Regions:
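Catalytic NTP-binding/metal-coordinating core of nucleotidyl cyclase/transferase enzymes
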Residues: 1-70, 74-77
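Catalytic beta-strand-to-alpha-helix segment of the class III nucleotidyl cyclase homology domain
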Residues: 55-120
Length: 120
């Protein structure tokens, strides 16, 4: 199926997990608390989690764009009142393409491209 794919990833999460696992888990919970409702509000569906990464799909281009902007805005506002070590910074990759959802997994070139765009 052709759909809009969002791939998010927390910057520095792997290093933070090695340095302070409790803080990493605390920030991940806060990350999820901020991001999940925004995706849902914009009619997206979270289809996969890979540690600190979220893969979501959307049916409309404006919804995935709105969701991305709202996520970055919410995190920017949240980070203003936190020290550098407690900031949540994410990268987001977006793509429109063909994916296959099977057994709670996402496959296909569309997924691969979105995940490869995210680090850029």
């Amino acid at each position: 199926m052709n759909t809009y794919i969002m791939f998010t990833d927390m910057v520095g999460y792997s290093k933070l997990t090695g340095d302070d696992q409790n803080l990493a888990l605390e920030l991940l919970k806060e990350h999820d608390k901020i991001i999940e409702p925004i995706i849902e509000k914009n009619e997206g569906s979270i289809v996969k989690r890979i540690g600190d990464a979220i893969v979501a799909i959307f049916n409309k281009s404006e919804k995935i764009i709105d969701s991305s902007i709202e996520i970055q805005t919410a995190l920017k506002k949240r980070n203003i009142s936190n020290t550098k070590s407690r900031q949540i910074i994410i990268r987001i990759g977006l793509h429109y393409g063909d994916v296959v959802l099977k057994n709670n997994e996402v496959y296909g070139l569309g997924y691969d491209i979105a995940s490869n765009i995210e680090p850029i």
